């Protein structure tokens, strides 16, 4: 079975704040406001002591157990108590492809829209039915994604393992009865190509796999084309991750690494953030060359020299792969790519609103509102001249000190002003948010400013 396209995100810059993205209707991730239980306004996850409880079907995949363990620890960070399993729990979790006849019958009696997700890989449903919060996944990954969506609803960031981000303490957690979510991926294979990752060890790969689980990514691209036994055992088996190698995606299962199924990926498409470099297909050899040997985008003249270009097809994309050296360098971009892979209307309200929402999820609405102008200005300045290009003769991009009202001085002044605003806002933050603020906001801003001053 052939998949016609794979998107390789060579650059994940945020130069597009001037873009006007809009859409007409929601898709993939659906939030319904139809009342399903008028007797109770909210379904509380917590008991009188503030402890969250859940119940799950008897037979589940290993990745679901990993997600449950993460969820239990997440709830401890929010309520002070780890979530526990309990038969009469308000949260009822089901992995569709592992249900017994009795369990499936019980799920049908609850009225969950099983038919909407049962035939789609990685899909899930979360909603209130008969005074219970029902969580259903079509397969192992879908169930794990749904469980970790609960963590996000409770205020736990997917990046909590990578940054010093502590969720806001809560005595109770609840879901209104008139809300439900159906997650159906638009892109079948969503993942990362870890470029220059030979320094990684199994512990770091496991950490990346946890992040992928929280971001709902399911694929790792083998840039070096080599399988490592420890890598496969720790990541592929445990986290149910697909491996893309030599333009083939393989899903593995079991300790003996038996092949489950395999798909061939053709017509590799590259997505760039530079307006001068339009989206177009390039041959696999070129992309592999870029993945292995370069950490920057080719110039327009370099691209013109390539003779193996061809017309893009109009069929559906089957894979989106983000080429990164370290996922920690692009948290917003990776989150945005994941959201768009699940819902093409994720940016319906515009990029500025998306940025605001993302910061609110990390720091809360009060602090997020303060930070948003800083990050918007940071992305604007780095799009004018990206820090990675400062020491490179990247075309005619040098600043002029005597022309255009001294654009060099104005560029550096804007960085100085941004640094001052950053320090002033940092002073107003509570102590438990300053470490996360430093990692996500202050460090990138000051680093970019220092590089600009140096060059």
Q: Across the structure, where does each feature detected by a protein language model lie?
A:
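Bacterial N-terminal signal peptides that target proteins for export
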Residues: 1-10
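Bacterial N-terminal signal peptides
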Residues: 9-18
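Contiguous, structured surface segment used for ligand recognition
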Residues: 23-184
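Aromatic-lined carbohydrate-binding surfaces of glycoside hydrolases
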Residues: 52, 57-60, 64, 79-89, ...
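Extracytoplasmic/secreted proteins, especially bacterial periplasmic and envelope-associated proteins
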Residues: 63-66, 70, 74, 142-145, ...
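Internal mixed beta-strand/loop scaffold within catalytic domains of large alpha/beta enzymes
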Residues: 123-128, 137, 141-164, 172, ...
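Substrate-binding groove of N-acetylhexosamine-processing glycoside hydrolases
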Residues: 178, 266, 273, 277, ...
């Amino acid at each position: 079975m052939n998949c016609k396209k794979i998107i390789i995100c060579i650059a994940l810059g945020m130069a597009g704040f001037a873009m006007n993205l809009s859409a007409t209707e929601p898709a993939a991730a659906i939030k319904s406001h139809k009342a399903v239980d008028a007797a109770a306004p909210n379904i509380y996850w917590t008991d009188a002591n503030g402890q969250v409880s859940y119940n799950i079907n008897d037979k589940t995949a290993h990745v679901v157990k990993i997600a449950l363990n993460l969820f239990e620890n997440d709830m401890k960070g929010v309520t002070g108590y780890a979530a526990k399993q309990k038969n009469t729990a308000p949260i009822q979790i089901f992995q569709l492809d592992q249900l017994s006849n009795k369990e499936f019958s019980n799920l049908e009696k609850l009225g969950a829209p099983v038919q909407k997700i049962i035939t789609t890989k990685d899909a899930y449903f979360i909603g209130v039915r008969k005074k219970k919060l029902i969580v259903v996944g079509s397969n192992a990954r879908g169930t794990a994604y749904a469980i970790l969506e609960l963590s996000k609803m409770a205020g736990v960031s997917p990046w909590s393992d990578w940054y010093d981000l502590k969720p806001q303490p809560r005595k109770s957690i609840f879901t209104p009865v008139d809300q439900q979510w159906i997650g159906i991926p638009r892109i079948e294979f969503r993942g990362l190509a870890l470029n220059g990752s030979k320094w990684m060890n199994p512990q770091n790969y496991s950490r990346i796999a946890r992040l992928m689980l929280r971001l709902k990514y399911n694929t790792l691209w083998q840039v070096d084309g080599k399988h490592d036994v420890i890598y496969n055992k720790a990541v592929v088996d445990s986290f149910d991750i697909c491996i893309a190698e030599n333009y083939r995606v393989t899903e593995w299962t079991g300790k003996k690494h038996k092949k489950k199924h395999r798909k061939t990926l053709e017509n590799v498409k590259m997505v760039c953030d530079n307006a001068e470099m339009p989206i177009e297909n390039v041959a696999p050899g070129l992309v592999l060359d870029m993945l292995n040997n370069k950490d920057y985008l080719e110039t327009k003249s370099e691209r013109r020299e390539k003779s193996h270009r061809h017309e893009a097809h109009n069929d559906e994309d089957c894979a989106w792969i983000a080429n990164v050296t370290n996922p920690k360098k692009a948290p917003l971009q990776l989150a945005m790519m994941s959201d768009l892979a699940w819902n093409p209307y994720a940016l319906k309200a515009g990029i500025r609103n998306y940025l605001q929402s993302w910061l609110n999820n990390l720091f809360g609405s009060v602090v997020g509102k303060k930070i948003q102008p800083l990050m918007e200005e940071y992305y604007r300045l780095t799009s004018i001249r990206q820090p990675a290009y400062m020491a490179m003769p990247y075309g005619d991009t040098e600043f002029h000190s005597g022309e255009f009202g001294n654009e060099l001085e104005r560029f550096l002044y804007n960085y100085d002003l941004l640094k001052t605003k950053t320090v002033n806002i940092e002073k107003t933050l509570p102590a438990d948010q300053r470490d996360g603020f430093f990692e996500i906001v202050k460090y990138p801003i000051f680093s970019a400013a220092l590089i600009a001053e140096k060059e």
